[in-house]
């Protein structure tokens, strides 16, 4: 067989095409690797879409209780429980879960800081918040009396308005200069639930902290706030490690088996946080694809 000088043989053409095919495949594989981690999400538009979803909640909260009713159903619904509401929100942002069920005011606080999230208009459930106290304690009657007075004189409304709405931050509750002959009142809370309780530097602040201070001002106690996991609060009250639990806690039949509750001091509702479909799409997948193509292009130069 005679080969013309400078003209590639069929074998050379074959191997060149084979290398080109592998190069193209490399482009796609590298692009996939760089874009990795982006997966299809279940679209949640209301309660009817929760079946089969990956739901995030804060451990031990009312949201946890209601979400548990979906757990283990035929649709394959799963519940991820987090010690902090912020951790559940972060899991939603990184596509580890499809939605978060949480109280409305903390939800509004989280969404305000994360415009890529939104709260569905459909309410999951409506509830009342109250203070948990050791069973059969005379403190229950004292706290109810103080709450009634604080409601009547507008103090409770002022505290709430200082954290929500257009007047937020303009009317803080100021600790009163009164005698405190009754010692220390220990309040157990979970400072991961803004605006009810959260940390501002070393201090624990929020709606519940202010309400507790107002109650102590009325009853002659010095207030001490102890931060702990939410699901440890009732045990702390039962065992006397804390006098009261104030942590955006709703009254439920299960909790009433272990502690007493004061009269409610506010109403709340559980809502569903999801990804905001109108938020600008993340550039991460595109950047990943470009990076993959760039690496593949460098590889092609070496062929």
What positions do the PLM features span?
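Ligand-binding clefts/hinges and TM-proximal coupling segments of bilobed small-molecule sensing domains
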Residues: 62-77, 115-123, 145-182
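Immediate post-signal peptide segment of exported/extracytoplasmic ligand-binding proteins
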Residues: 42-54, 169-204
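Extracytoplasmic small-molecule ligand-binding "clamshell" domains
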Residues: 78-82, 90, 182-248
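Acidic, polar ligand-binding/catalytic clefts
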Residues: 41-49, 108, 114-125, 133, ...
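Pocket-lining segment of extracytoplasmic ligand-binding domains
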Residues: 41-116, 136-138, 250, 271, ...
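Extended ligand-binding regions for polar small-molecule ligands
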Residues: 59-62, 127-169, 210-218, 274-282
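A cross-kingdom C-terminal cell-surface attachment/processing module
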Residues: 285-301
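Bacterial N-terminal signal peptides
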Residues: 26-33
């Amino acid at each position: 067989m005679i080969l013309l000088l400078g003209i590639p043989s069929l074998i050379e053409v074959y191997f060149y095409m084979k290398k080109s095919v592998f190069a193209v495949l490399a482009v796609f594989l590298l692009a996939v690797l760089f874009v990795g981690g982006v997966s299809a999400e279940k679209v949640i538009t209301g309660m009817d879409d929760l079946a089969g979803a990956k739901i995030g909640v804060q451990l031990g909260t009312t949201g946890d209780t209601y979400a548990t009713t979906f757990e283990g159903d035929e649709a394959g619904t799963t519940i991820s429980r987090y010690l902090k509401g912020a951790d559940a929100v972060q899991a939603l942002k990184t596509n580890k879960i499809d939605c978060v069920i949480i109280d409305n005011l903390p939800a509004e606080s989280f969404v305000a800081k994360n415009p890529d999230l939104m709260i569905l208009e459909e309410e999951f459930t409506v509830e009342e918040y109250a203070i948990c106290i050791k069973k059969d304690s005379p403190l229950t009657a004292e706290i109810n009396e103080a709450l009634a007075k604080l409601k009547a004189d507008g103090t409770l409304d002022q505290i709430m308005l200082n954290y929500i709405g257009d007047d937020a931050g303009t009317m803080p509750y100021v600790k009163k200069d009164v005698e405190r002959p009754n010692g220390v009142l220990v309040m157990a809370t979970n400072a991961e639930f803004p605006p009810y309780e959260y940390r501002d530097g070393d201090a624990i602040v929020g709606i519940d902290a202010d309400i507790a201070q107002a109650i102590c001002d009325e009853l002659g106690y010095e207030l001490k706030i102890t931060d702990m996991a939410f699901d440890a609060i009732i045990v702390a009250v039962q065992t006397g490690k804390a006098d009261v639990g104030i942590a955006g806690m709703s009254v439920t039949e299960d909790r009433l088996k272990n502690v007493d509750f004061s009269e409610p001091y506010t109403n709340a509702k559980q809502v569903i946080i999801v990804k905001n479909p109108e938020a600008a799409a993340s550039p991460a997948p595109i950047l990943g694809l470009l990076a993959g193509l760039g690496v593949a292009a460098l590889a092609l130069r070496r062929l």
